[in-house]
């Protein structure tokens, strides 16, 4: 009887102590006091040896019930203290959602990206397919398939980064055209645009870089004429530099086209009167083009008596420099935020 009363007193006092615990440390102390190895509830079990055998099961069950009650109350108090602590923390860290937020710095498209996408959008609208290719290319596709055999003197026009005797960093995106035509097994039409990085052994200066971007276009079909090329280039010039632009074709030489032309656009700054941009000529050179050489068609498996085509190639770097008044090509590749941030204002105004 005395042990039962002691058990009830321990239980009652434990519940009082649990409710008075104001923090996790105090609650842990209560747990040790009653449920630890030397705790009060643990001590009750030591008296079991003094009881008759028939009373031991009932007594043990009562002690376990007291232990379970205390454990349950400790857990409940633990959760309550945790909620109170969280509530207090939220009050202390309360955020005034009515305060104006900090503006997130927003970037803008790189001027080269803007120029490339503008050109791609135009030709996608004309039904061209955008095709990518290898930057590490075979000598055959970079030169021989484009009417530049190993003995051709025009190879001296392009100093190249060779990796092996037959592998090099491509010097133009024309290999994409050669590979695409080859895959068509002599069946037209072919209508592709090939943007990408190219590499040449140039000394870096304001107008030259060992790595730069290039976009080339190719159309192969029956009855393709020089007038088709001219109309396409006129549309490109107006898209890039304004509706009042005119183009001029000058005879030139490229091994992979015949006839070949250099393409000039009327100066968008002085309207043809002469200025520092056009070097007082009224015209600005923007790209090279021509009719696809019959040898190139034949090497790709096309019948040059049935199919004709035109090709053109331009440097988005140069076009972007002209459009945005940039005097040094190296600005495109140095990642200077001061330079790049200027184009955020251009983008905000919705300008191309």
From Swiss-Prot:
Pfam families (UniProt xref): Phe_tRNA-synt_N (PF02912), tRNA-synt_2d (PF01409)
PROSITE patterns, A to Z: AA_TRNA_LIGASE_II (PS50862)
Protein origin, superkingdom: Bacteria
Binding-site residues, Mg(2+): 258
Cofactor annotation comment: Binds 2 magnesium ions per tetramer.
Gene Ontology MF: a single term: ATP binding
Localization per Swiss-Prot or TrEMBL: Cytoplasm
Gene Ontology, cellular component aspect: cytoplasm
UniProtKB keywords: Aminoacyl-tRNA synthetase, ATP-binding, Cytoplasm, Ligase, Magnesium, Metal-binding, Nucleotide-binding, Protein biosynthesis
Gene Ontology biological process terms from the UniProt entry: phenylalanyl-tRNA aminoacylation
EC assignment: 6.1.1.20
UniProt KW Isomerase keyword: no
Cofactors: Mg(2+)
Reaction catalysis annotation: tRNA(Phe) + L-phenylalanine + ATP = L-phenylalanyl-tRNA(Phe) + AMP + diphosphate + H(+)
Subunit structure: Tetramer of two alpha and two beta subunits.
Family, similarity comment: Belongs to the class-II aminoacyl-tRNA synthetase family. Phe-tRNA synthetase alpha subunit type 1 subfamily.
Protein name as it appears in the record: Phenylalanine--tRNA ligase alpha subunit
Organism name: Staphylococcus saprophyticus subsp. saprophyticus (strain ATCC 15305 / DSM 20229 / NCIMB 8711 / NCTC 7292 / S-41)
């Amino acid at each position: 009887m005395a042990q039962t009363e002691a058990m009830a007193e321990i239980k009652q006092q434990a519940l009082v102590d649990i409710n008075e615990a104001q923090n996790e440390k105090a609650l842990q102390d209560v747990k040790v006091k009653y449920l630890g190895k030397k705790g009060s509830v643990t001590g009750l079990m030591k008296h079991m040896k003094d009881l008759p055998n028939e009373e031991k099961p009932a007594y043990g069950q009562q002690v376990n019930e007291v232990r379970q009650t205390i454990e349950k109350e400790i857990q409940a108090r633990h959760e309550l203290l945790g909620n109170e602590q969280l509530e207090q923390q939220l009050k202390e860290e309360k955020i005034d959602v009515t305060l104006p937020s900090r503006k997130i710095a927003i970037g803008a498209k790189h001027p080269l990206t803007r120029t490339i996408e503008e050109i791609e959008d135009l030709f996608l609208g004309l039904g061209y397919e955008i095709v990518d290719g290898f930057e590490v290319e075979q000598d055959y596709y970079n030169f021989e398939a484009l009417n530049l055999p190993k003995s051709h003197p025009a190879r001296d026009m392009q100093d190249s980064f060779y990796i092996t005797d037959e592998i090099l960093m491509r010097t133009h995106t024309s290999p994409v055209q050669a590979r695409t035509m080859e895959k068509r097994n002599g069946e037209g039409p072919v209508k592709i645009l090939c943007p990408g990085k190219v590499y040449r052994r140039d000394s870096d200066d304001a107008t030259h870089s060992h790595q730069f971007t290039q976009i080339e276009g190719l159309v192969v079909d029956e009855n393709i004429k020089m007038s088709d090329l001219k109309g396409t280039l006129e549309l490109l010039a107006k898209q890039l530099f304004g509706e009042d632009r005119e183009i001029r074709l000058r005879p030139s030489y490229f091994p992979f086209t015949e006839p070949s032309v250099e393409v000039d656009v009327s100066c968008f700054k002085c309207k043809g009167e002469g200025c520092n941009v056009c070097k007082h000529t009224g015209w600005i050179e923007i790209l090279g083009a021509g009719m696809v050489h019959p040898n190139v068609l034949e090497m790709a498996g096309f019948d040059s008596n049935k199919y004709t085509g035109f090709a053109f190639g331009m440097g988005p770097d140069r076009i972007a420099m002209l459009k945005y008044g940039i005097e040094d090509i190296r600005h495109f590749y140095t990642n200077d935020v001061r330079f790049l941030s200027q184009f955020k204002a251009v983008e905000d105004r919705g300008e191309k």
